[in-house]
UniProtKB/Swiss-Prot annotation:
Binding annotation for Mg(2+): E250
Keywords annotated in UniProt: Aminoacyl-tRNA synthetase, ATP-binding, Cytoplasm, Ligase, Magnesium, Metal-binding, Nucleotide-binding, Protein biosynthesis
Gene: pheS
Protein's recorded name: Phenylalanine--tRNA ligase alpha subunit
NCBIfam families, alphabetized: pheS
Provenance organism: Flavobacterium johnsoniae (strain ATCC 17061 / DSM 2064 / JCM 8514 / BCRC 14874 / CCUG 350202 / NBRC 14942 / NCIMB 11054 / UW101)
Cofactor(s) this protein requires: Mg(2+)
Lineage: Bacteria, Pseudomonadati, Bacteroidota, Flavobacteriia, Flavobacteriales
Amino acid sequence: MIDKIKQHIEEAKAFNEKNKESLEQFRIKYLGSKGLLKELFNEFKNIPNDQKKDFGQVINTLKAVAEEKVKQIQEELESKEESKGVFGDLTRAAEPVIIGSRHPISIVKNQIIDIFANIGFNVSEGPEIEDDWHNFTALNLPEYHPARDMQDTFFIQTNPDVLLRTHTSSVQVRYMENHKPPIRTISPGRVFRNEAISSRSHCIFHQVEGLYIDKDVSFADLKQTLLYFTKEMFGKSKIRLRPSYFPFTEPSAEIDIYWGLKTETDYRITKGTGWLEIGGCGMVDPNVLKNCDINPDEYNGFAFGMGVERIAMLLYQIGDIRMFYENDVRFLEQFKANI
């Protein structure tokens, strides 16, 4: 009899079913009102006196083992239920992690930054809510200058001197005010213009503008910098600079790259010419240098600017600028970058 009880003790110790149904069956088997321990205690009076001590010890051991096993598994099951409520079911098999991707605008912007960083340009940033001085006046656009009409501006209604910047040239002004030449910096960022939203234009877009100020800077330096950029960005080294007008540069030019006419899309985006405009550039006007406390008799330089969306549309053959702002995951997940 004692050996049989010891066998039950080992079975109770080995029990490890971690579910409520099996645990309840175990409890009833050993601790229930009609369970094994109840039968053994009833049998105690029939045991010879010389065996009662040993018999009582093994019965108590079996009871202690069974009670401890029930308590242990109950605590584990309760802890599991609590973890489900707070953290989810921690026993579920792991699911694959879907890694997001960078926005195409961020991908292209970072590529541009890396290209210019390789030739010594740093990155400068400034506020998107700007004042009239940094956005217009310091850039050779005094009040009532007709060229201000070239940029439809969002003004702050409560303060006409405060506005949403129309270009990142305002960052260049702030940089020149706080740094002495030589200067090599690019200013990426978001800009705002009161334009109708269509497939080709938006009231919010991104620019990257560059500024180089030093002694004896020439237009040839500007051209070589742009040739380097277009070769690195597009794999194309054929460009042309068309005379143009910007208040803050003189002379000024539009930057065109030769895109070619290999596909129907090429004909459409270049209007059959093979040439495509990507930005503007020019030699910094001496008045702009004066406004930033830089002596134009000692220093000169060049500036350039380009739209990030326009470049992204070229690289990825995207026909509608609005797609960048619709947050359509089906569109965004197509773009991958080394993060």
